[in-house]
Amino acid sequence: MANDERLTLSVDCGGLFLKSCVLDESGTMHSKPSRIETPYPLSPDRFIETIKGISDSLPAAYRATVGMPGMIRHGVVISTPHYMTKSGPRTKIDPELQEQWSGFDMQNALTKKLEMPTRVLNDAEVHGAGIISGSGYEVVITLGTGLGFAIFYGGSLSPHIE
């Protein structure tokens, strides 16, 4: 790897699977894509350990980007309905998990655990940042276990409208 080449650990966290790979700045993959089942029940600590395990299994990266479902503000989890359940999507929210996740600073926790700069955003926002042209209004809708949505204007993420 050239000294000026910056690799990013990219993790897409879904309700059923956690998908990951290492990318360079142009989006070229420097690892085979990885996919593991999302473990449940999934506390913030278990999530962090799972992401650490993913990181350790892939080539070294300079930084990380983690997209996860739910409302995320500046890397802090406001709500992540899939992960607040004991058995996964479309099951009853567990009050104890809800309390653990609500207000959890995932960006700071992952930055410390991975020992690299880490950005944590809503998964639709991460997806959109990778595909928008930067011209005018652009809407990104993602369909997976859940439905994701993001609006960009002039290449910048617009205020949240959940």
Feature map (PLM): residue ranges:
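Fold-independent oxyanion-binding glycine-rich loops
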Residues: 13-14, 68-69, 122-124, 143-145
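Glycine/GP-enriched mid-protein hinge/lid loop-to-helix segment characteristic of carbohydrate kinases
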Residues: 3-9, 21-25, 31-32, 41-46, ...
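Conserved phosphate-binding loops in N-terminal lobes of ATP-dependent enzymes
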Residues: 2-76
